[in-house]
Amino acid sequence: QFSKGFAELGEIEFFERGVQYLGCNTRRIDDNVWVRVNELILPNFTQAGAAFAADGTKTRYFGRSSFTRWVVPVDDHHSVALAWANFGKRGDPIKYNTKEGCERIEGGETMDRTFEEKQKKPGDTEAVEGMGTISAHKGEHLMPTDQGVMIYRRRIRKLVKSLQEGKEPPQPQQKKGEIIKTNGQDTVLRVPKRNFDDRKFIKSIGSAVMKIQFDLENMPLKDRDDKIINKLSEMEKSGKF
């Protein structure tokens, strides 16, 4: 089950960095502002921040992804997923490296729940399977909040067409052979409300967090992460976003 923080309605922004697409959801959790970034690297690589330790209640600077997933279609109704769980100080602790933890990180729940339990407390599995084995686009009513879905579909169609034309698929590396820098993360800053529109305020904080990442993306990986963490801490202390 998701933490209570996930129930908070956030301010969403989308960013494109080559074949890397980022959905930034910024939520207020009491006196904290939680910036969570879901990442998609086309065509089929996804990751976000922590799965179990993420609730927006504790300060965190550039916490990293706790799961990394590749999903490959088999046919129009089935797909195969290859997923890695990543444990560490900046993600989920190693105590979740169990069979139950593996099931929960992938499906949002343990797999042996009864039908009644799934109906009372639905998880990721019910959200996905409830749509059926294939998405019927004609029956959809897309909203502004579905911008990420629309971007993804548009870019996938473009990539498929380019591949059919014999063009080399684009790669996420900045330089051939270098480690791919990713952006999926959780950042939690202590920023109490101020005397103006809090929705606009927290959105500006999310934008400021992303700008720090983008400004430093050409640095070597270790240097980049350390610099991002320092910049986030400095920004929180200064109160300037």
Where are these regions (language model features)?
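C-terminal catalytic domain of Rieske-type non-heme iron oxygenases
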Residues: 1-241
